[in-house]
Amino acid sequence: MPKLKTNRGAVKRFKVTGSGKIKRAASNHNHMLTKKSQKRKRRLRKIHEVAPSDMRAVSEMLRD
């Protein structure tokens, strides 16, 4: 059986921490920002953790 490939799009969007958690950037922070409040945009700047329910799917895409 051949080696399974890593999803290259996922590699660019997620980063695995030393403890095994997966970090991701918030969505909704690229365009049409004038209608969003400063408070909302400030919250979207932060790096978030992948939810436990999504961990398996993201881990399989990263394959490392």
Curated annotation (Swiss-Prot):
Origin superkingdom: Bacteria
Gene Ontology molecular function: structural constituent of ribosome
Listed Pfam families: Ribosomal_L35p
UniProt name for this protein: Large ribosomal subunit protein bL35
Family (UniProt): Belongs to the bacterial ribosomal protein bL35 family.
CC annotations in GO: cytosolic large ribosomal subunit
Gene: rpmI
Species of the source: Coxiella burnetii (strain RSA 331 / Henzerling II)
Keywords: Ribonucleoprotein, Ribosomal protein
GO annotation, biological process: translation
